[in-house]
């Protein structure tokens, strides 16, 4: 699993991982991603000397291409059999965070026999234990029920409130780091990588007070006078508020 913050190059990491697996194991490889990021993958792949083709079903595959992109719906709806691929990576894999979702349950079954599986998404919150366990279940690292029993004590007063056993805390984080990479900033890779240009400067906030005349708040349909101007919910109301506050 690749858990990396925004802008750290998750797409490049996935492409290079699949390229190396393809060079060693052969076959065809696949990235499953939202439609909005497929051009980003194509651009980054070109930088690495790899050509990706976007497909929605197996019939669109060509003999001269081994690297493919598809969207989540094509796999979830059964249009594309992922078992024909040597390796598959799920970009924006946060769609798997909910155990009860159709996507998670479907993917858990159809990916069981895919030899090399990867997930890539932004770094989950450290206390989102169930989300981390769901990724482990999908990747075939450990069954979700087994992980819950092994590492956590339940709270009988509150559902889904998990607490790490104190004597299992170190073991849990070591286990997690045996299959997942966490990156919050470039310097997490070592002192040779600077955070300059990545760490944002402190946010400067300028407050502007706009005087409002509540005498023109108007009336309700029943004639009741409004105490305050109402929220600008519609286009005409928003335009009126803009004119009055410019």
What do these predicted ranges mean?
Residues 6-18, 25-49, 126-132:
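Conserved Walker A/P-loop ATP-binding site and its immediately adjacent core
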Residues 7, 73, 93-97, 124:
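Catalytic acidic motif of RecA-like/P-loop NTPases
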Residues 27-28, 47, 87, 95, ...:
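Conserved P-loop NTPase motor "coupling/switch" region that bridges the ATPase
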Residues 36-59, 139-143:
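Conserved helix-turn-beta segment of the N-terminal RecA-like "Helicase ATP-binding" lobe
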């Amino acid at each position: 699993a690749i858990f990396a913050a925004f802008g750290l190059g998750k797409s490049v990491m996935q492409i290079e991982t699949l390229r190396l697996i393809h060079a060693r194991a052969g076959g065809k490889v696949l990235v499953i991603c939202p439609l909005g990021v497929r051009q980003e993958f194509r651009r980054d792949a070109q930088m690495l000397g790899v050509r990706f083709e976007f497909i929605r079903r197996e019939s669109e595959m060509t003999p001269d291409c081994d690297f493919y992109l598809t969207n989540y719906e094509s796999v979830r709806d059964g249009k594309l059999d992922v078992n024909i691929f040597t390796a598959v990576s799920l970009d924006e894999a946060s769609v798997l965070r909910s155990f009860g979702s159709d996507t998670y349950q479907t993917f858990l079954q159809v990916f069981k026999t895919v030899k090399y599986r990867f997930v890539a998404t932004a770094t989950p919150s450290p206390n989102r234990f169930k989300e981390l366990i769901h990724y482990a279940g999908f990747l075939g690292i450990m069954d979700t029920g087994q992980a819950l029993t092994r590492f956590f004590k339940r709270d009988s007063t509150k559902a889904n409130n998990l607490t790490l056993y104190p004597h299992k805390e170190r073991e849990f984080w070591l286990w997690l780091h045996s299959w997942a990479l966490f990156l919050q900033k470039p310097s997490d890779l070592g002192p040779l990588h600077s955070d300059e240009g990545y760490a944002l400067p402190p946010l400067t906030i300028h407050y502007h007070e706009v005087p409002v005349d509540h005498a023109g708040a108007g009336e309700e349909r029943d004639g009741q006078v409004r105490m305050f101007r109402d929220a600008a919910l519609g286009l005409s109301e928003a335009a009126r508020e803009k004119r009055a506050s410019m």
